[in-house]
Amino acid sequence: YYEGKFWSEMPDLNLDCEAVRAEFDEITSFWMDLGVDGFRMDGAKEYFSDNTTENVEVLKWFNDMVKAKDENSYIVAEVWTDRETYAKYLESGIDSVFNFDFGDGDGIIANAVKGSSESGAKGYANVCGKMDELLSQYNENYIDAPFYTNHDMARGAGYYSGEYKAAQIKTCLLY
């Protein structure tokens, strides 16, 4: 028997186990020796299901271990939850958390382009400023990681029902 949060064929890792952490160390060394200079930490909210404190500790350990090998490495975590919670993950010292408020069909980018929420460029800039204030409380050196869509969401162009210009604008808002 093992715990499989996402799928019965995908066992969860026991991140309290020193042997598992040692394996992480070896795996990161392997990839970094090949030139990899960053890591995406998938499903970080579920390392210890919905236990932000323990999850932040794991990310801090991972961040410290990776940055000891190369201080310029980049680490981003996927923490699909509300902004107040995912902001706390930056306390771990990682560089970024994916900014889920920006993604999806009702996200900040889509709503700004559609003019349906804090419409237009001024509203978008206002939201970006508020997000910066929140995230920098937890890590003043964070790098924002907004995105429009990902592999767990519908494709972005479909949010506009054939509005080609709107699809172009939303992509520009990421830069």
Specify the residue positions occupied by each region the protein language model found.
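Conserved interdomain hinge at the start of the Helicase C-terminal
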Residues: 168
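Short, acidic, Ser/Thr-enriched surface-loop or helix-capping motifs
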Residues: 148
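Short acidic/polar active-site loop segments enriched in Thr and Asp
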Residues: 37
